[in-house]
């Protein structure tokens, strides 16, 4: 809730990741700090269609920001999407998340017109990566 209010779609996915992500062919990734065994970042790969997946729910703890954790998670989810045979990886975000948008561009995502109304009121940017 630091940047946006938690919406019903957030509650649904975060409240049942096994049912909403994993059972549908997706996966949740975690970054764990060395030594402390503490989760410092996470993101999800959500299967949308046979050849399309979404990078979603990326978050990095305050103490881990600026330490390339987001980059490592992004690279890992891209590698996983390729290994699973997806041809396109998409994401929805908000332009005020400037560091995140810069990261997505660094990972190769390209801004595209928003193709359909989002489940989230905060979405004002849509990006795609051809795998």
Which residue ranges define each predicted feature?
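Active-site acidic-Proline motif in GNAT/NAT acetyltransferases
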Residues: 61-63, 67, 95
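Acetyl-CoA-dependent GNAT
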Residues: 1-56, 61-63, 74-76, 80, ...
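Conserved acyl-CoA
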Residues: 72-89, 103
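Short glycine-rich loop/turn motifs that provide flexible caps or phosphate-binding loops at active sites
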Residues: 40-43, 69, 92
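C-terminal "cap" of GNAT-fold acetyltransferases
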Residues: 87-131
């Amino acid at each position: 809730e630091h940047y946006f209010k938690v919406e019903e779609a957030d509650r649904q996915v975060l409240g049942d990741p096994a049912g909403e992500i994993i059972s549908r062919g997706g996966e949740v990734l975690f970054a764990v700090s060395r030594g402390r065994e503490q989760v410092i970042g996470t993101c999800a790969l959500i299967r949308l269609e046979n050849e399309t997946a979404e990078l979603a729910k990326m978050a990095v703890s305050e103490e881990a920001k600026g330490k390339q954790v987001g980059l490592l998670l992004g690279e890992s989810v891209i590698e996983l999407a390729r290994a699973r045979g997806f041809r396109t990886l998409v994401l929805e975000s908000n332009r005020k998340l400037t560091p995140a948008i810069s990261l997505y561009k660094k990972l190769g995502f390209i801004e595209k017109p928003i193709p359909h109304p989002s489940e989230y009121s905060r979405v004002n940017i849509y990006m795609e990566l051809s795998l």
